[in-house]
Curated annotation (Swiss-Prot):
Molecular function in Gene Ontology: tryptophan synthase activity
Catalytic activity from the UniProt record: (1S,2R)-1-C-(indol-3-yl)glycerol 3-phosphate + L-serine = D-glyceraldehyde 3-phosphate + L-tryptophan + H2O
Highest taxon above the source species: Bacteria
Its biological purpose: The alpha subunit is responsible for the aldol cleavage of indoleglycerol phosphate to indole and glyceraldehyde 3-phosphate.
Family to which the UniProt record says this protein belongs: Belongs to the TrpA family.
Matches recorded under Gene3D superfamilies: Aldolase class I
Gene for this chain: trpA
EC numbers for this chain: 4.2.1.20
Active site per database record: E50 (proton acceptor), D61 (proton acceptor)
Record-given protein name: Tryptophan synthase alpha chain
Disulfide bonds, paired cysteine numbers: none
GO CC annotation terms, alphabetical: cytosol
Keyword field: Amino-acid biosynthesis, Aromatic amino acid biosynthesis, Lyase, Tryptophan biosynthesis
Involved pathway(s): Amino-acid biosynthesis; L-tryptophan biosynthesis; L-tryptophan from chorismate: step 5/5
Amino acid sequence: MTTRIDTRFAELKKQGRSAFVTFVMAGDPDLATSLQVLKALPAAGADIIEIGMPFTDPMADGPAIQAAGLRALHSGATLSHTLGLVRDFRKDDDTTPMVLMGYYNPIYIYGVDAFLADAKAAGVDGLIIVDLPPEEDSELCLPAMKAGLNFIRLATPTTDEKRLPAVLANTSGFVYYVSITGITGSASADSAAVGDAVARIKRHTDLPVCVGFGIRTPEAARAIAAEADGAVVGSALIDALQKSLDADNRATKATVGAVADLVASLAAGVRGAKQAAE
């Protein structure tokens, strides 16, 4: 099974560059604007798109992404709406990989089998579920793989050599390395430490390793992209979106452009990095 994610990384490897992975929250600040933002991302330079599934208790997320989730929930966004956004995006773009990221509870309530069928039909390529450890693989990971979706696992600075094989066992698509301990948007990533961590993970897997948390500038994106197969940016994009909203947290004429302009700037940073020697 070759997914859009596999195809995209193969293309990027031929080009000798790393992936630029963007994260935005579904339904932030409303569904119509959210779709416009999603459609603007590939043209601005996003290689892979992660879409946050709004949830009431996002324990791993920092203030920016928590606020984005609340704006989305207040606008009425549900998991069904999130899948609808992917479906609408796919009407114009059948190549950019789309990964849903979030927590298990909304999927459990939706129903695992129904969710996987609907996600696949909508055009979702992979899942990142931050609160399902490998010990729970039978809940969602294995059924997702059977449905043809990549299940992307998080590794962290505290994932030691003993734990890493379990983390990687049923991972596919790519490995998401969380470069700092703590919540999203909280600190800056250290590219030297990231390089060591990526090398350690790659001793255990042939999968691409993407690095997220703590990347906010083109310079930081370039430094991380030189060490990894991809750089993931979320909080900085959500900050840019939030700053473009009016006093009532409604979208303005500047909202889509504010996100797209930052994506273009960060993408230029990623493209300026030389892929680390294999």
